[in-house]
Amino acid sequence: FMNTQLFFNPVNPQQKDFWHRDCQYDYDVDDQMKVIMETQVLHLRVPIFDEPGMELIPGTHKRWDNEEEYNVRQEENGKVSSDDISGGKQIPLAAGDLLVFSADMIHRGRYGLDRLALDILIFDSAADYVDYVDDDCLPTPAMLSNISDPRLFMNTLHLKSMLCS
């Protein structure tokens, strides 16, 4: 378990939705190429209201960008990250749906309607992501005792304790 997040429309209504891999915010391009081949972060999205959903480039969690994807995502050669990418699959979501995808896949949230979604991120425990775990997202010991199968959280707590020792 890594954290939970709430996603909503940007404050600036002029902001366009943009293609990215979550790992691009923490790694340079060379390291991104390694990360997507070695580890994965699982992203679970549950919309609170109907929303335009997500757009994904299938298979990109296991391969590097082609020229078009790279240019758009990195805003090179006259492209911007909000440009359409051929091969993108839009997945509209209704309130209560569950979308599961790799955060390392090229993707973008689609803005519009009253977008509000709860996202849950789960990391590969073999990876070096424990420093991204937000303590505020972890259950207390009292909460853990009420969870029928707390192994996911127990694993994260164990990894965090190893980091601190």
Where is each model-derived feature located?
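Non-heme Fe(II)/2-oxoglutarate
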Residues: M105-S165
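Non-heme Fe(II) oxygenase catalytic core, chiefly the N-lobe of the double-stranded beta-helix
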Residues: F1-D97, R108-L113, I120-Y132
